[in-house]
Swiss-Prot record:
Family: Belongs to the UbiA prenyltransferase family. Protoheme IX farnesyltransferase subfamily.
Species, as recorded: Geotalea uraniireducens (strain Rf4)
Record EC number: 2.5.1.141
Cellular component terms per the entry's GO annotation: plasma membrane
Protein name: Protoheme IX farnesyltransferase
Amino acid sequence: MVLAGRGMPGTKECLICLTALLLAAAAAAMINGVLDAKLDARMARLHRRVASLERIGAQRATVAAAGMLFAALALSITFLPRLTTALILLAIFSYTPLYTLWFKRRSPWGVVPGGIPGALPVLVGASAVSGTISSAPLILFLVMLLWQPPHFWALALKHQDDYRRAGVPTLPLVRGEAYTKVCIFVFAALLLPASLALWFTGACSARFAIEALCLGFFNLFSCYLYLVKNRRFQRAFQASIFYLLGLLSAVIIDICSRP
């Protein structure tokens, strides 16, 4: 929203958009939990999610998800541009039927198209502010698409036994650890030119470019340190979160500090 509006958005539109996004995301997560219940039950790290769903019940969870989705769409249709509503619907559709029921269960590369719903909130926020989608939010959308696969693969490396028991064909299980680590490095490297495109197109300043470079090299070094040298996959997962938070913060500070 900051990038598209070239500054902090209005309080009202920001709250409405964030509320609609949170409701839609919560609804999608609950539906995902219901659809993946049998898979989750085989994974030790998800025992709390399974226990929570058992206490609530699949039917109640589905009804609650439908209610939250209705509320999200009602807010969006009433107060936000039509494009924003369409993008919210696209995010839900690409996550629930496409990723959860298709890509995740059939391909080790499913996380790549599965990153679309995770990146679409960037365009949702941009369209809520301007009613259109300009080049700068599209670049940030690309950054989010490139960031998500290596972020997930680090987690998949750590929890290989869980995914094996669940029968989910993750990249480490299908192609091996070494191949997965190479893919993580490739995607981490691609984040450098993708983030610098915000400076190259004039959306952000040279100061941001320096910060993006530093963060990008930090991300690559973290991949080497935690994937190759020490095999501490959880740390690699956490470092990627720090990278993204740093990059998004740099964008906001750069835009909002301009005279």
